[in-house]
A protein has these predicted regions:
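Extended, low-polarity transmembrane helix blocks
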Residues: 1-36, 54-62, 66-69, 73-164
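Membrane-interface interhelical connector segments
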Residues: 35-55
């Protein structure tokens, strides 16, 4: 379906809220791992049986921080989506899969407030879908990729897979 006029112009902005949410989410998770102590995350990976837990903890933190910032500013989206997707898939399979789909497991409501159980893999799938959407559709206006493509004259529009 061909979009014309205003709808076509607005479509280009679709990636911006996805980039903001996904980029911020990865940065927040990476930052939390740093603030809580990388050794704590290393211990979690070791308990899950992840090989080279210390190296993998730091690699994950670096990917979440750097990759999250890259997604946030729309830089090198197809490239940074690969390690970020790998992190999501590993988390979904090794941590969240046994708890089912739902990301919210309300166990009970007490005087102290609601008590939740472990999250399922729903959020991992949503992040994967958002990354795939940005990769396929391009990072949109107000992105490093768009600026780079326009400045270098590489692509005729955005920098998504659809533009190659």
């Amino acid at each position: 379906m061909q979009l014309t006029g205003r709808a076509s112009r607005l479509r280009a902005w679709a990636a911006l809220p996805l980039r903001a949410i996904v980029g911020y989410g990865f940065v927040a998770h990476g930052y939390a791992k740093v603030v809580n102590g990388p050794d704590r995350f290393t211990a979690t990976l070791r308990a899950l049986g992840v090989p080279w837990a210390h190296a993998m903890a730091w690699l994950t933190i670096a990917c979440e921080l750097i990759g999250g910032l890259a997604v946030l500013v729309g830089a090198w989206i197809p490239l940074v989506s690969l390690p970020l997707s790998a992190i999501l898939l590993v988390a979904a399979i090794t941590v969240h899969l046994p708890y089912g789909f739902s990301s919210i497991k309300l166990r009970q409501v007490t005087a102290a407030g609601p008590q939740f159980g472990p999250p399922g893999y729903e959020t991992d799938l949503l992040y994967l879908a958002a990354l795939a959407t940005i990769v396929l559709g391009g990072s949109g206006p107000w992105s490093f990729d768009q600026w780079w493509a326009r400045d270098a004259g590489i692509f005729r529009s955005g920098v998504g897979i659809s533009d190659l």
